[in-house]
């Protein structure tokens, strides 16, 4: 075993970080210690994970995640259609001027209102109940499902809840996994809006996902670690 790989695997950070990556979590600069570790050992860890038929990816925005190949030896699951739509909306909000105005913080209600304004409400309700009649009960169920999707994306490192207030969150750059492909000269926010309204698929269908048990109640690692840098 190469000396540098042995050093990485024996590091106290590695066991928990490895578990998070295998579970689908995205590691951005918000998790400074883990991010620096991955930067330092990226090359040897790429070789290590290739043995499991997954790729350690460093995205252009700087965050890390594992991308499985079709022959992966690590269990995986796929995000639901609603999860992916919520992810697209989060990416749209990240690109919005409001993110800077609000210091990057949004509320669940703002997310829900943006979702209804940009996507077809009848199609959203069908995701919750195929026989939806557009009743208040159906809308209530949709809002609950959106909260569940948001919590699932939190577990993947896409957002952080603000302290003990789960109604507010900060979006991380990892939401660019849900971003539209932008050609040179195109406006990124407009491209994202087109993808949302056209219902285009986004390229995370092969991504790893955390187990979905207790999504609504799991509050582990809700808040961003303290770092010396703002997002």
Curated annotation (Swiss-Prot):
One of its GO terms (cellular component) is nucleoid. GO terms for biological process: cell division; chromosome condensation; chromosome segregation; DNA replication. It comes from the Bacteria. Keywords: Cell cycle, Cell division, Chromosome partition, Cytoplasm, DNA condensation. Pfam families: MukE. The keyword NADP does not apply. It is found in: Cytoplasm, Nucleoid. Residues 213-231 have a biased composition (Acidic residues). Residues 195-231 are annotated as: Disordered. Belongs to the MukE family. Interacts, and probably forms a ternary complex, with MukF and MukB. The complex formation is stimulated by calcium or magnesium. Involved in chromosome condensation, segregation and cell cycle progression. May participate in facilitating chromosome segregation by condensation DNA from both sides of a centrally located replisome during cell division. Probably acts via its interaction with MukB and MukF. This is Chromosome partition protein MukE. It comes from Pectobacterium atrosepticum (strain SCRI 1043 / ATCC BAA-672). The gene is mukE.
């Amino acid at each position: 075993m190469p000396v540098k790989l042995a050093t990485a695997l024996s590091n106290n950070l590695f066991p928990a970080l490895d578990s998070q990556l295998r579970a689908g979590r995205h590691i951005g600069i918000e998790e400074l210690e883990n991010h620096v570790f991955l930067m330092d050992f990226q090359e040897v860890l790429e070789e290590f994970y290739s043995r499991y038929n997954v790729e350690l990816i460093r995205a252009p925005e700087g965050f890390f995640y594992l991308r499985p190949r079709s022959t992966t030896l690590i269990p995986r699951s796929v995000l639901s259609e609603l999860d992916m739509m919520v992810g697209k909306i989060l990416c749209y909000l990240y690109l919005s001027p409001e993110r800077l105005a609000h210091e990057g913080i949004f509320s669940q209600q703002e997310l829900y209102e943006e979702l209804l304004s940009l996507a077809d409400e009848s199609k959203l309700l069908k995701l919750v109940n195929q026989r939806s009649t557009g009743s208040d009960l159906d809308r209530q169920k949709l809002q609950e499902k959106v909260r569940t999707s948001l919590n699932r994306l939190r577990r993947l490192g896409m957002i952080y809840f603000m302290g003990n207030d789960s109604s507010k969150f900060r979006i991380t750059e990892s939401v660019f996994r849900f971003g539209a492909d932008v050609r040179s000269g195109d406006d990124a926010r407009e491209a994202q809006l087109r993808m949302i309204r056209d219902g285009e698929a986004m390229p995370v269908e092969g991504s790893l996902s955390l187990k979905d048990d207790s999504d609504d109640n799991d509050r582990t690692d809700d808040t961003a670690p303290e770092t010396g840098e703002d997002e």
